[in-house]
Amino acid sequence: RCVSETAPGPGNPDQAGNCLKIVKDLFNKIPILGVCLGHQIIGQVFGAKIVNAKKLMHGKTSKILHNKIGIFKGLKNNLVGTRYHSLIIDRKTLNKDFIITAKTKDNVIMGIMHKNYNVHGVQFHPESISTKEGMKLIKNFLKYK
C-alpha cells in the first residue's frame, strides 16, 4: 500500500512547487493525506479557492468538531488541533465531490474527504504534540480503504 502526505507550508498552493501536479497526477492512484498547505493544495486541485482566514492561527489551538467518519472515526469530538495557517479553503467553492469532515465552531473547514477516492485533508496539524488525538488520526489514514 502506497501513501503520500503533502507536507505543510509555508506559503500558498501556487508556491508549493510540484505538489499541485503530484496531487493531480496521483489522487486516483494512491491514498493522499494533505496537512495544512497540503489540505489547501487538495482543495485547489479540485477547484476550490484558497482565501485569507479572518484570523491568523499561528501556533494556536482550536476545538475541532467532526462527523466521526473517514479518518476521524473513533476520535473524540471537540478534539484539540494545533493550527499554523493564515489561509483556508473557501467553503462556497469546495468541490461537491468532497465531504466536509471537520470544522471549527466558527465554521472554518478543518477536514475534507473525497467521496470516491482515498483523499483526505486536514487544516490543523495532527503531527503536533499539542494535537492529542493526532496520531490516532494518522493511524486511521494508514488503515483507511
Specify the residue positions occupied by each region the protein language model found.
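Conserved hydrophobic/aromatic beta-strand scaffold that supports enzyme active sites
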Residues: 61-63, 109-111, 121
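Active-site-proximal beta-strand elements of phosphoester/diester hydrolases
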Residues: 81, 119-124
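Histidine-centered divalent metal-coordination motifs
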Residues: 36, 85, 125
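Catalytic beta-strand/loop cores that center a nucleophilic Ser/Cys/Thr
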Residues: 70-116
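Glycine-rich nucleotide phosphate-binding loop and flanking beta-alpha elements
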Residues: 11-12, 90, 130
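Short, small-residue-biased leader/transition segments that mark boundaries at the very start
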Residues: 1-3
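Acyltransferase
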Residues: 129-145
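Cysteine-nucleophile active-site neighborhood
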Residues: 6-74, 78-80, 138-139
